[in-house]
C-alpha cells in the first residue's frame, strides 16, 4: 500500500493507494470509531461496492446510505438536498461522518454537503473511477453545477482521508477509464515531462490494467496534486495550472448538456485547444501539439470539440469561467511538455482563430 500526505497543517490528511483497501478496516478505524456513518453513493456503484464497504464499517458505528442517480446531470442543488434531507430526517449530528463512495460527482456533492451541514462535518473520499482517484478526490474542491455553469456553487473543504482501491478500476467501463486518462495525461503536460514520457511508453500496460502501472500512475498524479495543493490550497496561484484544458472543457460540457460528454472527454478536447492556442501564440511548436494529440488518441479520447460548437458558443461559457478576473479570460497553456502557465492576455480574435481552425 502506497501512502501520500497532503500537507495542509491542521487540515493535512493521507491518501492510501493499493488493492482491496475497501476491506481494510484497520486503515479506516481511526476516522470512524464511535461515529454515525452515512455513505453517499449512486445507482451504478451501490450494487458493486456498497455492501462490501458497509460490512467493513459496521464494527465502527451505525452505517446508513443514500443512493443517488448516476450522472453529471444529477450534480445539482436538488440532489444535494437529498443528502441534507437524509441527514436531518435521521438526526445526524456534528460527530457524524459522510463517506463519498463513487466517482467525481459523488465526491464533489458529498464533500459540499459535509462542508455545509451544521457548518461542517467530517467526510471520507473512497473514489471508484480513475478520474476521481487521480484528481477530484484530492484537494478539497467540492461543488454542484448550475444550469449556467459547472461547479459554480461550492466550497474548499478537505476530507479526513482518501482511500483509493485500484481493484475498482476492473469494473469501470472502458469509456470512463479513458476519461480518467485525460486527467492523468494533464499532469504530465503541465508538471512532469518524465511522467509524460512514461505514459507514452506504457499505454498498453495501463489499458490492460496492469497492477503496477496503475499504482504508479495514480500515485504520481496524487503526488503532483498533493504538492500543488500544499502550496496553494484555494487556487490563488500555482493550483490554477491543474485547470489545463478545463476552460475549454467546461464550455463543452455546459454547451452539450452535462453528462453527454464525460468530463474527461471534454478536458481531452479542451487540452488540445489549449495546446493549439499555445502554438498560435508561439509558446510551443507543432511537435508538442502532435505528441499531446497522439497520447490522447492512444487512450481513445476525443481530440476535437463537437462540430456543433462554434466560437460564439465557446466564448459565452468561457466568460463565466471561475478564473476570469477583471473581465479577462485567463487560460492555462502549456509552454513545454512538463510546464504550463496562466495567460490573461489572450485576445478573443486569437481564440476565434484557434476554434475555427480546430
UniProtKB/Swiss-Prot annotation:
Catalytic activity: 7-phospho-2-dehydro-3-deoxy-D-arabino-heptonate = 3-dehydroquinate + phosphate
Cofactor list: Co(2+); Zn(2+); NAD(+)
Primary location recorded for the protein, binned into one broad class: cytoplasm
GO biological process: amino acid biosynthetic process; aromatic amino acid family biosynthetic process; chorismate biosynthetic process
Positions of NAD(+) binding: 70-75, 104-108, 128-129, 141, 150, 168-171
Chain residues that bind Zn(2+): 183, 246, 263
Name listed for the protein in its UniProt record: 3-dehydroquinate synthase
GO cellular component: cytoplasm
Pathway per the UniProt entry: Metabolic intermediate biosynthesis; chorismate biosynthesis; chorismate from D-erythrose 4-phosphate and phosphoenolpyruvate: step 2/7
EC number: 4.2.3.4
Subcellular location: Cytoplasm
Cofactor binding note of this UniProt entry: Binds 1 divalent metal cation per subunit. Can use either Co(2+) or Zn(2+).
Species in which this protein is naturally found: Shewanella baltica (strain OS155 / ATCC BAA-1091)
